[in-house]
Amino acid sequence: MSSATASNTFFLHSCFLLFCLLSAPSCVSMFSGIETGDLEKRDDLFPQILRDEAVARLYELGKVSDASGYLERTFLSPASMRAINLIRKWMEDAGLRTWVDQMGNVHGRVDGANANAEALLIGSHMDTVVDAGMFDGSLGIVSAISALKAMHVNGKLQKLKRPVEVIAFSDEEGVRFQTTFLGSGAIAGILPGTTLEISDKREVMIKDFLKENSIDITEESLLKLKYDPKSVWGYVEVHIEQGPVLEQVGFPLGVVKGIAGQTRLKVTVRGSQGHAGTVPMSMRQDPMAAAAEQIVVLESLCKHPEEYLSYDGHCSDSTVKSLSTSLVCTVGEISTWPSASNVIPGQVTYTVDIRAIDDLGREAVIYDLSKQIYQICDKRSVSCIIEHKHDAGAVICDSDLSSQLKSAAYSALKKMEGDIQDEVPTLMSGAGHDAMAISHLTKVGMLFVRCRGGISHSPQEHVLDNDVWAASLATLSFLENLS
């Protein structure tokens, strides 16, 4: 998941916890740890490939790091280059034809029985945040390769009804250049040519960094990386949930209904800097007090939009209802100047992260919040500047793809567990994924995998071995029933 879109995922998932519990009432006692028993002997479950080898590969990839003592693998770093070679080897082992494009994405493709048909893309990202867990992104890559290898050893790979291409995207987290989806964005064709001019903290531009890695790229060649929409049938991504819902309801897998849209704001409040002991309270123009009031207003607005959101023709009843179940707002950074205990600040800056599945509702919240921020500034005789730093629309997953993924997950879990009385849960994603970028190219579907405690972007991130198995088996079932 993108670090730029990762804050407060817990709260968004929690909004859907009640729904999941109601839709799967007896799930809490199921799948708490699937008993393997005789499953080891089932040839159709491929435990050696889909579990043992897949888990071993995840741990092997988790050791490919630029840092000593923790996992860090950023865009085209030395560790990333080693990961590229490793992933290519695994793809070739699965019978796939491989190549690396000019943005560092690793591709593995099989044409199947009809090379001219629209291709299914399956992927996730191979980069990580700093001090990362080893399942974020990597699970989606490894599970796809494992499923195709199972088909390869079973003689079914060339019988696929359409081409299938696994893509390990080079950069989703945006750690080095502070811009997300460099890998998937190139494939989707949503990166402007000016992307190559973006610099890191050392003032090294992306195009120069690529040249350092023996990749010559121009604005023209960047645009040529875009896939022809007519050549692509759809995109599927398997990813850890990065939240607690699946663990709470006792299901290893869940289908993603959609990905929340996100807006990031930077608010700067300027007042009158002064001595903390000599300026009377009644005479202060304190930007910290103004910022504090604004943050409380934000919390009230986002906790209870039905009570605090003004309608003003910007927000319908249905939009407010949607916001009440999906809206989350976070102030993640705050700084003061000069930041001294005995000085009234002259300036306060803070960030606002707003996410919701309803784009109109999110825009209504931004409109109302901005209006109230300026009103508070006027009341307190301070000045305010609101900057829009990032905006991404919500993505609704394709209903047909989601239905197929749900059937595949159900089939996999039934094979592993036996009779299942409840439906596979459906969840929203509060975090951003490569599927958001690829949605500009084709229809998308996502499958979530349970992770312990909902923890992600942390060394404590963990997925049970049998849940890796379930994810790979569900991917295999999806591929075997591909239309």
Swiss-Prot record:
Homodimer. Binds 2 manganese ions per subunit. GO terms for molecular function: allantoate deiminase activity; metal ion binding. Residues 1-30 form the signal peptide. Pfam families: M20_dimer, Peptidase_M20. Belongs to the peptidase M20A family. Mn(2+) 2 binds at D136, E173, H457. This is Allantoate deiminase 2. Expressed in stems and leaves, and at low levels in roots. Not detected in nodules. It is found in: Endoplasmic reticulum. Involved in the catabolism of purine nucleotides. Can use allantoate as substrate. The sequential activity of AAH, UGLYAH and UAH allows a complete purine breakdown without the intermediate generation of urea. Keywords: Endoplasmic reticulum, Hydrolase, Manganese, Metal-binding, Purine metabolism, Signal. It is an enzyme of class 3 (hydrolase). GO terms for biological process: purine nucleobase metabolic process. Gene3D superfamilies: 3.30.70.360, Zn peptidases. One of its GO terms (cellular component) is endoplasmic reticulum. Its EC number is 3.5.3.9. It comes from the Eukaryota. Its main location: endoplasmic reticulum. It catalyses: allantoate + H2O + 2 H(+) = (S)-2-ureidoglycine + NH4(+) + CO2. InterPro entries: Amidase_Cbmase, ArgE/DapE_CS, Bact_exopeptidase_dim_dom, Peptidase_M20, Peptidase_M20_dimer.
